[in-house]
């Protein structure tokens, strides 16, 4: 198994974004089923408590979910009164999200096919920007962070949950990754190839994220490397061995 190597952002393969889009298009159906099961499990309440402790208090706030996938955060937060907008690069994922949220008291959530690096919203439009397991897929995560800063209101909150999944693929026994137990071997290998195409795979995170967010102009930037201990303490069908972190920042 080849080792990860540092790739300058400007030297990434031209087709990396298309490869990421293709991968998630193929996974959209099974991924949606997995999120349906997660939304009907104890994990929904676990994530609801996790997010509400770190988001602005009270309902009615506009929240942008970047890389929304099948709409799990919308299913968790829309019933709490948050005005949810989900964006994803993959049309198939957006289709799955609309269907799933229509059945989970989250029909008011809005969904758009949109690039995380180019969110087409006015400056200062959202009270919060949230994301889960997205930034590891981005060819230009610093540009994405800059755009998320732009669309946030002054005092708005950024919450990003992610992990060093590329390093974890080489570090952990993949039999421990129960969340991917039903993912086809060909897609696992496709994901592995994407890891090696992305500069972000070799970065030291969340240290890199904290540095970039401070440089952009966020304040109160904090990295919590214990998020995975809270959110993935049970080895069930949602378990991933990778050490999830949470980066929180305020505009």
Q: Predicted segment positions?
A:
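A short SAM/SAH-binding and catalytic strip from SAM-dependent methyltransferases
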Residues: 128-141
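C-terminal alpha-helical "lid/dimerization" subdomain adjacent to the S-adenosyl-L-methionine
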Residues: 15-19, 163-233
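Conserved beta-strand signature within the Rossmann-like core of class I S-adenosyl-L-methionine
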Residues: 156-163
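Class I SAM-dependent methyltransferase SAM/SAH-binding core
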Residues: 64-66, 70-118
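Core SAM-dependent methyltransferase catalytic element
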Residues: 216-219, 233-251
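Conserved class I S-adenosyl-L-methionine
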Residues: 2-58, 72-76, 104, 227
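A short glycine-rich, Lys/Arg-flanked "PGG" loop and its adjoining helix->strand segment in the class I
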Residues: 142-154
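A short acidic, Gly/Pro-enriched loop at the edge of an enzyme's catalytic core
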Residues: 117-128
